[in-house]
Amino acid sequence: MHNLTIAEIIQGLKNKSFSSVEITQHFLNRIKTLDTEYNSFITLTEEQALAQATAADARLAAGDAPALCGVPLAHKDIFCTNGVRTSCGSKMLDNFVPPYDATVVTNYSQDGVVILGKTNMDEFAMGSSNETSYYGPVKNPWDTNCVPGGSSGGSAAAVAARLVPGATATDTGGSIRQPAALCGITGIKPTYGRVSRWGMIAFASSLDQAGTMTRTAEDAALMLQSMASYDRKDSTCVDHPIDDYSVNLNAPLAGLKIGIPKEYFGEGLNPGTAEAVQAAIKTYEAMGATVQEVSLPHTHLAVPAYYVIAPAECSANLSRFDGVRYGHRCDNPKDLEDLYRRSRGEGFGEEVKRRILVGTYALSAGFYDAYYRKAQQVRRLIKQDFVDVFSQVDVILGPTSPSPAFEFGSKGSDPVAMYLEDIYTIATNLAGLPGMSIPCGQVDGKPVGLQLIGNYFAEAKLLNIAHKFQTETDFHTQAPAAIK
């Protein structure tokens, strides 16, 4: 049953081939048996999941159930879950049990989704390898000596290992698309504001966006349909009509205009990755799309601008974790300053501390104009690059990551090398655009991701373009050798 897609599970539940309790128990048993190898889950909610599955079966029997009712999924451990620990991968929140659900969690609960547990992640979503988690690194199911990508590495590995058919995730600079690429699955980051951030623990508020991880674009459409909503509790959520993401999945691509940014095929791109992406582009041409080279001239400034803006926002957001109201609290503080210093020093990991310090420096009185203001000006130029390109083409294609999965520890001593893993994904977040990654090949037995970038609120078009590729190829059906 674990090889079934979400769409197939929905059909199986409808046909009574199995019950929600049966398939939920199957995945729970699989997680308990196999996840000692991958470490993709922080918390398993077995008792709650079986209760939800029982309720879903009753709802299905009554004949009035939403599409995802009874389907088992998992949440990245950044979404607040009422009564269930939400750690954000950090010692700081190791004992935090929220008294409420995030809007994303509520949306899925209302649709009768069964939640198997909370997935591992880089601490406070800061990382590109899932090596910064307080709960230990997640291993890539394709090669357990390699990272799964980050920060949503737990969700990506769990989906790739068939421990769960789909999972929620978040993307601040590539944290859905990059691990999706490295684990050979489908990941979508919607337009900024398409999905509520309420109850999603903040890293960089102007960049964070929730999305999904699945094996297919068809499944991504089903998950996004439930996730997307307008929410008054999130002031950045946009009141924009929500498309039916499944209805046009099979629309023909004849006449589709594809832009290929020349800046995405320069120095640093693995030759095998480039070859796989170029082959994918030829597949689209065979389906009737036209391809033209385009330019995003400020691409080289995306990483430096991001690593001023994101740490600055992180510095402000993480100031709330002071050991007073919730989160880690040091023992026997001498005074208030000692409480702050030791609680934060003990609660945060090295990468989080690094970004807080960088952000605080960038926001300080003497450097605000030189760094933060300048980075925001660059952000505006990057956004204009995309506006200009989308006046010529319908979608942008390129590599998701410069290389396939790398070995643990190979980039940890060089933060800049790690940051450059997101060189092709960061600009999309700075501009607030939707982006996807779908598998398009392999290099040395490890997956390669093709990135699709769309115009604002063009998620339905991206899903159509991704689905059509998956009807012509079988990369999305391939599984790691160890998966049975």
Swiss-Prot record:
Keywords: ATP-binding, Ligase, Nucleotide-binding, Protein biosynthesis. The active site is at K76 (charge relay system), S151 (charge relay system), S175 (acyl-ester intermediate). One of its GO terms (molecular function) is ATP binding. One of its GO terms (cellular component) is glutamyl-tRNA(Gln) amidotransferase complex. Its EC number is 6.3.5.7. It catalyses: L-glutamyl-tRNA(Gln) + L-glutamine + ATP + H2O = L-glutaminyl-tRNA(Gln) + L-glutamate + ADP + phosphate + H(+). Pfam families: Amidase. PROSITE patterns: AMIDASES. It comes from the Bacteria. Allows the formation of correctly charged Gln-tRNA(Gln) through the transamidation of misacylated Glu-tRNA(Gln) in organisms which lack glutaminyl-tRNA synthetase. The reaction takes place in the presence of glutamine and ATP through an activated gamma-phospho-Glu-tRNA(Gln). Belongs to the amidase family. GatA subfamily. Heterotrimer of A, B and C subunits. This is Glutamyl-tRNA(Gln) amidotransferase subunit A. It comes from Saccharophagus degradans (strain 2-40 / ATCC 43961 / DSM 17024). The gene is gatA.
